[in-house]
């Protein structure tokens, strides 16, 4: 998605937005972690385009200290660990470094679609923010996945699938 471009949040969001804008109809966005941040950002910027929103392990104000600590750890990890992200190590470090200032608190009121906020019971880095986010969005519901951590789609796929299907069945 960022081929030939700088690994920054701004570039990633621009590429994501361009993909979403290709759809003529309203869209339903579902994102996990960084994907949730991108989906939330898009729903804020394009409230009339997003029909529904699912945010898994979401943040609405980036935890600056946590991101900086994470980046410090990334510097000591081998390059091979980053293949799962689809980025090079330097790109992940760069991307995280550009996200520390993200803060959507003043814009959450622009999200007008139904939203499902999901977080794993053991996802200590995101659970508090996810619960808060659900309370700030006007038409939202929070669901905690039992026994799941940050990678809820891997750790609780059946429960997540059930929760998603129930939500999608109620989206008009």
What are these regions (language model features)?
Residues 1-28, 162:
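Active-site loop/oxyanion-hole signature of alpha/beta-hydrolase fold enzymes
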Residues 9, 40-45, 49-80:
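Flexible "cap/lid" loop of the alpha/beta hydrolase fold
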Residues 31-39:
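Gly/Ala-rich beta-loop-alpha elbow adjacent to hydrolase catalytic centers
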Residues 80-104, 122:
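Hydrophobic, aromatic-rich cap/lid helix
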Residues 110-111, 117-119:
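Short beta-strand/loop motif that positions the catalytic acidic residue
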Residues 124-129:
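Conserved alpha/beta-hydrolase "acid-adjacent" motif
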Residues 130, 134-151:
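Catalytic histidine neighborhood in serine/cysteine hydrolases
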Residues 148-157, 161:
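Catalytic histidine-centered segment of alpha/beta-hydrolase-like enzymes
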């Amino acid at each position: 998605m960022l081929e030939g471009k700088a690994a920054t949040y701004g570039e990633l969001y621009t590429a994501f937005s361009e993909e979403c804008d290709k759809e003529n109809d309203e869209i339903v966005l579902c994102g996990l972690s960084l994907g949730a941040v991108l989906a939330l950002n898009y729903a804020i910027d394009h409230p009339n385009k997003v029909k529904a929103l699912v945010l898994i392990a979401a943040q609405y104000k980036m935890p600056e200290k946590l991101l900086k600590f994470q980046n410090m750890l990334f510097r000591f990890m081998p390059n091979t660990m980053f293949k799962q992200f689809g980025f090079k190590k330097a790109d992940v470090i760069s991307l995280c470094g550009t996200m520390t200032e993200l803060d959507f608190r003043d814009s959450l009121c622009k999200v007008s679609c139904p939203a499902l906020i999901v977080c794993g019971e053991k996802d200590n880095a995101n659970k508090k923010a996810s619960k808060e986010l659900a309370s700030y969005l006007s038409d939202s519901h929070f669901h905690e996945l039992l026994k799941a951590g940050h990678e809820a789609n891997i750790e609780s796929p059946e429960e997540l699938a059930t929760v998603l299907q129930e939500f999608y069945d109620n989206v008009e």
